[in-house]
Structure formats: structure tokens, C-alpha cells
């Protein structure tokens, strides 16, 4: 997870032409839309597809969620901290 969050932050700091990540980082609405689409795909996979497909769709959801966090200058660490605070 650290490697992926570092890559996304690096794309934001050092954009690469043609990068899908950069396209999402430049458009918060598009990033949010992709999170919604991927969440729907996770639900569909969980209800009617293979375990492998569930894992693939969940990976897509996590990636797009991390990009959306980065558009808001938030991080995976912020999410982990919120989860930890819920269990105190």
C-alpha cells in the first residue's frame, strides 16, 4: 500500500503525459465518479462472480479511492488513523 500511495503522490508532484493517474488527479469529479463505478463493480462481483474477480474489483476500488484521497490532499494514513480511533 505504501508503494502505491507513494506512486500516486509522485504522479501528482511530477505529472507524466498520458498518465491515467494524472488524468484522475486533475479532475476530482472524475476521480469520485470512478470510485462510485468501482464500488458498484465490487458489489456485482461479490454477489455473482468468482473470488478472483472480487479481488480484482476490490483492487480497482482501492486504487481509485487512493487517487480520490490524493485529490483532497488526504492520505491512506488518514484513513488508517480514523479506523484506529474507532476502536479505542
Language model: regions and residue ranges:
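Flexible "arm" and connector segments at domain edges
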Residues: 1-58, 62-88
Amino acid at each position: 500500500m505504501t508503494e502505491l500511495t507513494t506512486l500516486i503522490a509522485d504522479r501528482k508532484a511530477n505529472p507524466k503525459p498520458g498518465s491515467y493517474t494524472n488524468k484522475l488527479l486533475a479532475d476530482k469529479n472524475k476521480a469520485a465518479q470512478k470510485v462510485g463505478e468501482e464500488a458498484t463493480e465490487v458489489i456485482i462481483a461479490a454477489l455473482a462472480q468468482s473470488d478472483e474477480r472480487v479481488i480484482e474489483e476490490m483492487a480497482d476500488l482501492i486504487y481509485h479511492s487512493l487517487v480520490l484521497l490524493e485529490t483532497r490532499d488526504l492520505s491512506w494514513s488518514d484513513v488508517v488513523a480514523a479506523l484506529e480511533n474507532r476502536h479505542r
